[in-house]
């Protein structure tokens, strides 16, 4: 809470933010007097709102007699929402049904999480999947494709999966590749992909014996790491931007979409905003002016104490913070549990 506000100003500011989030219309003193039990006259409310504007908590649009919250006003409101309220029974049921009906494999979790968050919050969702290089090797498996080819499947504990078609060299058999998978699994089990050493590779080569088959194994692991310093980014609900009154300016929306199309920029934003627990970055707290009319809510997810990735909601500064925060917090817990269950 802000120390420069007395209790009456806090009540009025809270009411202004709450009403503006619900209505998207500038809030006047008469509206507050009618809808909220403040126990004071519209004239007194009007004077207090003028003080709140002078203190930087409210802004006065030129085309309206009412006022809207500033980034500072929203910050007051969001800080007052702690601790986060639990999800409703209906929200909980939808989240559980979504995962139950749509997720069968670990590699489906992240895309469906992005779709779920966007669907429930009606905002843009961002899900940063685990980094391949930091993931712990789980298993290399080969599946027969035809006489001359097999499908190599590399899996990690964090849900990363790399599929690649490999050629079976002349003189080799599918059984040779199965033997090679056994040697790789025995040597690398429980080891981070980025920690694989030359000594590990020598052990695998010695166990396999055949140089051409060994090269195929190394190529699969190299492919898994190539360009994967960060995990894959999943977006959901970008069309939701146009449903908000704040984003009827097409130039503003176009600028946001251009940034969202740049995976490297979005990952930088998520890394900047991510912290312990739930982090809310509001309006002009964002470094990029493209998002000065937007807010990010981010959360990091962990398995076995290891940081795996980030999930986030992007919406207008007028977003329904209470709902978005409780949804993201609950989905974050379920995502962690889902990864843990499906990795075994």
Residue ranges of each PLM-predicted region?
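Generic N-terminal leader/targeting and pre-domain segments
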Residues: 1, 82-83
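Short alpha-helical segments that sit at the start of domains
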Residues: 1-14
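Alpha-helical hairpin
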Residues: 4-5, 40, 69, 87
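N-terminal helix-turn-helix
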Residues: 16, 26-81
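Short, locally clustered residues in the helix-turn-helix/winged-helix DNA-binding domain
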Residues: 17-21
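Intrinsically disordered, acidic Ser/Thr/Pro-rich low-complexity regulatory segments
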Residues: 75, 79, 85-344
């Amino acid at each position: 809470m802000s120390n420069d506000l007395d209790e009456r100003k806090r009540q009025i500011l809270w009411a202004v933010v709450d009403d503006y989030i619900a209505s998207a219309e500038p809030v006047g003193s008469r509206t507050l007097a009618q809808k909220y039990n403040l126990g004071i006259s519209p004239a007194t409310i009007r004077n207090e709102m003028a003080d709140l504007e002078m203190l930087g908590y409210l802004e006065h649009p030129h085309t309206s007699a009412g006022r809207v919250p500033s980034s500072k006003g929203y910050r007051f409101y969001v800080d007052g929402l702690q601790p986060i309220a639990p999800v409703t029974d209906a929200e909980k049921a939808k989240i559980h049904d979504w995962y139950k009906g749509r997720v069968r494999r670990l590699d489906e979790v992240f895309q469906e999480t992005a779709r779920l968050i966007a669907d429930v919050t009606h905002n843009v969702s961002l899900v940063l999947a685990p980094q391949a290089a930091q993931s712990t090797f789980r298993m290399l498996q080969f599946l027969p494709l035809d006489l001359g080819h097999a499908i190599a499947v590399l899996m990690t504990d964090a849900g990363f999966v790399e599929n690649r078609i490999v050629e079976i060299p002349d003189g080799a058999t599918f059984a040779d590749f199965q033997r090679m998978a056994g040697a790789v699994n025995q040597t690398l089990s429980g080891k981070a992909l980025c920690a694989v050493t030359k000594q590990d590779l020598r052990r695998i080569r010695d166990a396999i014996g055949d140089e051409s088959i060994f090269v195929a194994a190394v190529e699969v692991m190299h492919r898994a790491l190539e360009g994967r310093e960060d995990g894959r980014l999943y977006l959901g609900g970008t069309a939701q931007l146009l449903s908000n009154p704040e984003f009827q300016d097409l130039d503003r929306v176009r600028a946001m979409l251009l940034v969202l199309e740049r995976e490297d920029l979005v990952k930088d934003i998520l890394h900047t905003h991510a912290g312990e627990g739930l982090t809310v970055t509001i309006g002009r707290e964002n470094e990029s002016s493209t998002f000065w009319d937007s807010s990010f809510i981010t959360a990091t997810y962990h398995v076995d104490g290891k940081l795996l990735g980030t999930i986030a909601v992007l919406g207008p500064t007028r977003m329904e913070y209470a709902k978005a925060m409780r949804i993201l917090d609950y989905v974050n817990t379920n995502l962690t549990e889902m990864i843990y269950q499906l990795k075994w």
